[in-house]
Amino acid sequence: MATLNGTSNGHGKMLSLTLQIWRQKNSKTKGRMEEYKIKGVSTEMSFLEMLDMLNEQLIKEGKDPVAFDHDCREGICGMCGAMVNGYAHGPDEATTLCQTHMRSFSDGDTITIEPWRAKAFPVIKDLAVDRTSFERIIQSGGYISVGTGGTPDANAIPIPKEAADRAMDAAQCIGCGACVAACPNASAMLFTSAKISHLANLPQGQVERHLRAANMIRAMDELGFGNCTNHGECEAVCPKEIKMENIALMNREYFGAMM
């Protein structure tokens, strides 16, 4: 039987929490913080499972459940994301919101949950935001359109180990938007640079490298993202630990394109 108020039932410690959650009908309406009490939250639950539990409670009370983005819940897809007590994805480093567990919190805690805050990420509802601006950046050039041969040819092209490692590290970006949410300028330069760096380090990406950088940076600016001023907040909250050195590479690519 479940036990409350910090005791254990054999399935992790049970928590009683106060949740301060941003509620907003859509991007055109004013939002507000609403407070909810929730009991019997196991420390073995993920953060999203805790929100599921809250929504079950709200539905039983005849109230509107909290809208939030999610999909794989395995830290892979990049769909989930929210500001938790002022931190993108929560208190744990290199962790997505869905992989954050309630053992990171204590009984009696008050947890403040807000959506990503950025002009380019308008609120859809509550904690869910529209991140199609990232897709538009990719559409502007984050791909290879030239012929690169058949599938077997990929294994026949020599790539230096260091270049392959840099490309693989950059390719880990899942497009969650935490970098934008954490940045005081709402800059998307870590995201954009990861996509540019991924392809710039591969031989298949060389033909279009300068055009790619110019087009993706232009799209990023047109979509309303801010510029990078080297605060480093993006790297600090990135769940895949994408490094700011990719931004330096992107700037070099852009300068090359403008010459």
Regions found by a protein language model. Give the residues of each.
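Short, contiguous acidic and Ser/Thr-rich linear segments
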Residues: E34-S46
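Eukaryote-biased recognition of intrinsically disordered, low-complexity regulatory segments
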Residues: M14-Y36
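Short, structured protein-protein interaction patches enriched in aromatics and acidic/basic residues
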Residues: A67-M79
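Short strand-turn-strand beta-turns centered on an Asx-Gly dipeptide
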Residues: W22, I38-K39, V84-G86
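Glycine-rich phosphate/adenylate-binding loop and adjacent beta-alpha elements
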Residues: V84-G108, I113
